[in-house]
Swiss-Prot record:
Keywords: Cytoplasm, Membrane. It is found in: Cytoplasm; Membrane. Interacts with RII subunit of PKA. One of its GO terms (cellular component) is membrane. It is a peripheral membrane protein. It comes from Gallus gallus. Belongs to the WD repeat neurobeachin family. It holds the Pfam family DUF4704. Its main location: cytoplasm. InterPro entries: NBEA/BDCP_DUF4704. This is Neurobeachin. Residues 77-90, 689-710, 750-762, 782-793 have a biased composition (Polar residues).
Length: 793
């Protein structure tokens, strides 16, 4: 809402939603589905609007970048996407990287105007030009050598923009690769094929006829001597394997005339001009390293037709090995270039690779007579686009591009830089997110449902159980339990999750700082999550623990396994109990920090009130809900203990489900006791020596097979443990009708199945004592291992 009028309309719409949802939950069988559908529709609507807003912002940024490029006056004749931003002014033997930009698709490529290029090369994506622009001299009249590498175009679909990254990395002028001969040069080809799946192998065997062609550009020139990549001095030409790079004419009709062309101008001293055109639609990852000796005579290369040939036996086997091993390794093939006397060919099909792979071309230029080195990292981006796509310029930035390795995530900034323009991403609804609309709808609906429950509680003659178990309210109870089950686990996750909360509660220094480190997920703040948690817990107290409804029908409707609803309720109870434990520990710390000399109960109570007012936990800020923490010194509050009992004893039948719930409760209490009795056994590790002595006593008593006495270290703890047990039972028995869970006196015979309350607490006390014993033994053994060094101190 942008103004007060829209705010009023928004409130009216929310009120209508609340009325309709409340009516569906209270009066209609299956009304819970109305809430689920409303939630899903609202969720998809919110996320779709956010997606459209993101696309609009991205398009605005794209237009702004284009306007900035136009204002800068940067114009080029070649359609390109270039991330090259660094220009160097080099002397002899240096390199210069020129940016050639794209401003219009209608402009003719530079290679077609400056050099006689055949018309079947219109599908070039990238051209690399070697010239001598550094020297600032006039245009040399010498002809050029044009080398084109054509790859097979795969799966070009309309309205699809697939980005391909070309990374020219680590241009190294290392003297180790120099050839001492005057006409010698070393060309090293490094090929790395990555992210190619097994489908590529099948396509290679079945339907791939693509090949790479190295052809002439100067067609009007007469045939001349050919450059062979076989060094006669070092290696005989008989070992060379023919490697003919050819292209398929039938594929050229599918090629796009407006694909981007990127030119990288690298100066050289001689009149040699070499154009490498790499058609990288397939995304083959290849590293080409070329060395040209500047002393070679220009008469060999001027106005002649040249073809590059290979001398590597391993070149033809690289592709088989790479495909067989899913292209996991690097294969190197060396090609040496010498005098142009012989001609031989070698053909190899290029695998039909997924277009998401990447071509990386690295060129090393070695100057045989210059000792200087210059290393440049060039990172470029080329884009394969559909017919409706447009060529986009990306200037003045060095892109750190993702080389297609799926383990290398890109940051949002890098993704924006990498994006050539507004992409038409398919919209997908996220799994779950607490949008403000969702929270508002849930708040209003819970308020309406809680109003009914509050009316039940405040009734003068009927108890809560009478309302819950009456036939006229069965639809309400059924749908509300569905509603609670739908969101309880998401609320628990939003509160931090049970395991992170237990970790914070059982750590020696557990405090709110650890809770603050728990990542807020799903778009809901921790305060809001705790508020919803307490409200759902209050509803569960009434509708689940105080009802005799069989949940098998609800579980069948939700496709849950048997007992799944009670397990959800147990998770909810445990989450609330752990948060109460953390709140108690926080209050104790604040009380100890503020004053350690106050012993009066009245002053302690006053201090507790001050601490609670200072903390202002979200649970206490819930309207109409008092804090469940009555005694901060206790491990579990009365309400938490009653809820755990209600989970265990709700089902009268002794089934595996009931045993599972009881075992889970025992484990949960055992874990929580670590947080309680660690503070007692190890206050601040002040008496390490006495602790080690106690550990020896424990070990002697445990190892003694005839020992029937209680170890000497336990009387205090057992007294501390056992003395409050009857008091706790009395408190529990007296507080059961008045707990917040809504469990009344009428419910207790059903819950306990006719058994006495004290008899039911016996196993709990015994298991608690056994867990205390085991934890003390463990801690004493730890202190025993630490005792020698501390005794020496």
């Amino acid at each position: 809402p942008k103004n007060s009028e829209e705010q009023k309309i928004t409130e009216m719409v929310y009120n209508i939603f609340r009325i309709l949802l409340y009516h569906a939950i209270k009066y209609e069988w299956g009304g819970w589905r109305v809430w689920v559908d409303t939630l899903s529709i609202a969720h998809s609507k919110v996320t779709y609007e956010a997606h459209k807003e993101y696309l609009a912002k991205m398009y605005e940024e794209y237009q702004r970048q284009e306007e900035e490029n136009i204002k800068k006056g940067k114009k080029g004749n070649v359609s390109t996407i270039s991330g090259l931003s660094s220009q160097t002014t080099g002397a002899k033997g240096g390199m210069e990287i020129r940016e050639i930009e794209d401003l219009s698709q209608s402009q003719s490529p530079e290679s077609e105007t400056d050099y006689p290029v055949s018309t079947d090369t219109r599908d070039l994506l990238m051209a690399t030009k070697v010239s001598d622009d550094v020297l600032g001299s006039a245009e040399r009249p010498g002809g050029g050598v044009h080398v084109e590498v054509h790859d097979l175009l795969v799966d070009i679909k309309a309205e699809r923009v697939e980005a391909t990254e070309v990374k020219l990395d680590d241009m190294d002028l290392s003297p180790e690769t120099l050839v001492t001969g005057e006409n010698g040069a070393l060309v090293e080809v490094e090929s790395l094929l990555d992210n190619v799946y097994s489908a590529a192998v099948e396509k290679l065997q079945n339907s791939v006829h693509g090949s790479v062609g190295i052809i002439k550009k100067n067609e009007e020139k007469d045939g001349g001597p050919l450059i062979t990549l076989a060094d006669e001095k070092d290696e005989p030409s008989t070992n060379s394997t023919s490697f003919l790079f050819d292209k398929i004419p039938s594929q050229e009709e599918k090629l796009l005339p407006d694909l981007s062309i990127s030119h990288i101008s690298i100066p050289n001293v001689q009149d040699t001009q070499m154009h490498l055109g790499v058609n990288d639609d397939l995304g083959l990852l290849a590293h080409m390293t070329g060395g040209v000796d500047i002393t070679s005579t220009s008469s060999i290369i001027e106005d002649k037709e040249f073809k590059i040939h290979t001398n590597s036996v391993g070149m033809s086997s690289i592709f088989e090995r790479e495909l067989a091993s899913l292209f996991k390794g690097l294969e190197y093939a060396e090609m040496t270039a010498t005098t142009p006397e012989t001609e031989f060919f070698c053909s190899k099909t290029v695998p039909n690779v997924d277009a998401g792979s990447i071509i990386s071309v690295t060129e090393r230029f070695v100057d045989g007579k210059e000792a200087g080195k210059e290393i440049r990292k060039i990172q470029t981006t080329t884009t394969t686009q559909a017919v409706q796509g447009r060529s986009v310029t990306q200037q003045d930035r060095d892109l750190r591009v993702d080389l297609g390795f799926r383990g290398m995530p890109m940051t949002e900034e890098q993704r924006r830089q990498f994006s050539p323009g507004p992409r038409t991403n398919m919209f997908r609804i996220p799994e779950f997110k607490w949008s403000p609309m969702h929270q508002r709808l849930l708040t209003d609906l819970l308020f309406a449902l809680e109003t009914d429950v509050h009316v039940w509680r405040s009734h003068s003659t009927k108890s809560v159980m009478d309302f819950v178990n009456s036939n006229e309210n069965i639809i309400f109870v059924h749908n509300t339990i569905h509603l609670i089950s739908q969101m309880v686990d998401n609320i628990i996750i939003a509160c931090g999750g049970i395991l992170p909360l237990l970790s914070a509660a059982t750590s020696p220094t557990g405090s709110k700082t650890e809770l603050e480190n728990i990542e807020v997920t799903q778009g809901m703040s921790a305060e809001t999550a705790v508020t919803f948690l307490s409200r759902l817990m209050a509803m569960v107290d009434v509708l689940v623990f105080a009802s005799s409804l069989n949940f098998s029908e609800i579980e069948a409707e939700k496709n849950m396994s048997s007992g799944g609803l009670m397990r959800q309720c147990l998770r909810l109870v445990c989450c609330v109990a752990v948060r109460n434990c953390l709140e108690c520990r926080q209050r104790q710390r604040e009380r100890v920090n503020k004053t350690s000399l106050i012993s009066s109960k009245a002053q302690d109570a006053l201090q507790g009130v001050t601490a609670s007012a200072a903390t202002k936990t979200p649970l206490e800020n819930v309207p109409g809900n008092l804090s469940p923490i009555k005694d901060p010194d206790r491990l579990l509050q009365d309400v938490d203990i009653n809820r755990l009992r209600a989970v265990v004893f709700r089902d009268v039948d002794d089934s595996k489900q009931a045993q599972f719930l009881a075992l889970a409760v025992v484990y949960f209490i055992s874990v929580l006791m670590v947080s309680k009795y660690r503070d007692i056994l190890e206050p601040q590790r002040e008496t390490a020596r006495s602790g080690s002595q106690a550990g020896r006593n424990i070990r002697q008593e445990i190892n003694s097979p005839t020992s029937t006495e209680t170890p000497a270290v336990f009387p205090e703890n057992i007294k501390d443990k056992e003395t409050p047990t009857p008091v706790e039972d009395i408190q529990l028995e007296s507080s059961i009708p008045h707990t917040d869970s809504g469990i009344g006196e009428e419910q207790m015979p059903n819950i306990l199945n006719g058994t006495d309350l004290e008899t039911s607490t016996g196993p709990d006390a015994m298991s608690e004592l056994l867990s205390t014993l085991s934890s003390e033994v463990k801690k004493s053994q730890e202190s025993l291992t630490e005792s020698p060094s501390e005794i020496l101190k």
